Amino acid sequence: MSLSIDVTSLPSISSSIYKHESSSTTSTISGKSIGRSEQYISPDAEAFNKYMLSKSPEDIGPSDSASNDPLTSFSIRSNAVKTNPDAGVSMDSSTQSRPSSHIGCDQVDFSLNRGIKIDAMVDSSISISTKSKKEKSKHETKNRKCYPKIEAESDSDDYVLDDSDSDDGKCKNCKYKKKYFALRLRMKQVAMQLIENL
């Protein structure tokens, strides 16, 4: 199971991608050939030296130095270019030869011999409703209208209760004792009504 990617030469972009031409052996995009063609190279020092000397220094990349040992690196490369279309690793093989391509719900398929085709299933939905909020605001305004209006009047600032008297809930020596208790009762009713509405 291996994938062949040859980046030895970088010519112009192949026209077969745009003309939808089919190729039985390899498909090219940006000068990088990815295909099922088998390439056998003799893994000896002479062939390796000839191969490396035939390339310009700009074209030598990381794929040419997979190991510090030149012979091991060359052997790794020679084995990597042998591909099997039925193993599911060749990118230009058809989807029928890859049984694992139909597994799962989301599928991304690359077909380089007839252009690039990407299939993905994406679904999203956003729903925003403001109906309940409007009804709630109307309900709150109705409750506010039902609240009793509280009015308190005082003839003079001399009749303000002391803190000690107000904490005990009693009004001693106050001319407005009846008004005080009536006002306190109304405030208690309003507080209870507020608690019930909440």
Swiss-Prot record:
Compositionally biased tracts (Polar residues): 91-100
Q: Which residues form a coiled coil?
A: none
Cofactor dependence: Mg(2+)
Please describe the post-translational modifications of this protein: O-glycosylated. Hyperphosphorylated on serine residues, when in dimeric form. Phosphorylation by host CK1 is required for the hyperphosphorylation of NSP5 dimer.
Residues at which Mg(2+) binds? 92
| Pfam families per the UniProt record, alphabetical | Rota_NS26 (PF01525)
InterPro entries in UniProt? Rotavirus_A/C_NSP5 (IPR002512)
Query: Which sequence positions carry the modification called Phosphoserine?
Result: 67, 154, 156, 164, 166
State its role.
Answer: Plays an essential role in the viral genome replication. Participates, together with NSP2, in the formation of viral factories (viroplasms), which are large inclusions in the host cytoplasm where replication intermediates are assembled and viral RNA replication takes place. Orchestrates the recruitment of viroplasmic proteins such as capsid proteins to these factories. Participates in the selective exclusion of host proteins from stress granules (SG) and P bodies (PB). Also participates in the sequestration of these remodeled organelles in viral factories.
The text of the family note is: Belongs to the rotavirus NSP5 family.
Q: What is this protein called?
A: Non-structural protein 5
What does the record give as the organism's lineage?
Viruses, Riboviria, Orthornavirae, Duplornaviricota, Resentoviricetes
